[in-house]
């Protein structure tokens, strides 16, 4: 019984002790090469889907709008709609913050 009384404060301390999360599990901004390195780390041999568009393949909403005969005022509305629809990895992890668990969604 006396032994239990001596260890009771230690047991209480261990029960209340909460380790800090490691940096790997903390949500953080990941941009550019840091984002790619994190994807390699998380996905490993599975790999991840990444096909960058060349400058010519990137859609230009202004050119597309002019081809459709729209007015320049409509271009701002279109740009806002496109910005709202973007929910890619850069928006999720660079513009915003994400965890390594969220990065797993982009693995093959």
Curated annotation (Swiss-Prot):
UniProt xrefs under PROSITE patterns: INSULIN
Residue positions assigned to the propeptide: 57-85
Gene Ontology BP, a term: response to cytokine
GO cellular component, as recorded: collagen-containing extracellular matrix; cytosol; endoplasmic reticulum lumen; extracellular region; extracellular space; secretory granule lumen
SMART domains named in the record: IlGF (SM00078)
Family annotation (CDD domains): IlGF_insulin_like
Keyword vocabulary terms for this entry: Carbohydrate metabolism, Cleavage on pair of basic residues, Disulfide bond, Glucose metabolism, Hormone, Secreted, Signal
Record GO terms (molecular function): hormone activity; insulin receptor binding; receptor ligand activity; transmembrane receptor protein tyrosine kinase activator activity
First-listed, main subcellular location of the protein, grouped into a coarse class: secreted
Pfam families documented for this protein: Insulin
PANTHER family the record matches: INSULIN (PTHR11454:SF9), INSULIN/INSULIN GROWTH FACTOR (PTHR11454)
Protein role: Insulin decreases blood glucose concentration. It increases cell permeability to monosaccharides, amino acids and fatty acids. It accelerates glycolysis, the pentose phosphate cycle, and glycogen synthesis in liver.
Assembly with partners or alone: Heterodimer of a B chain and an A chain linked by two disulfide bonds.
Similarity field: Belongs to the insulin family.
Protein name: Insulin-1
Origin species: Mus musculus
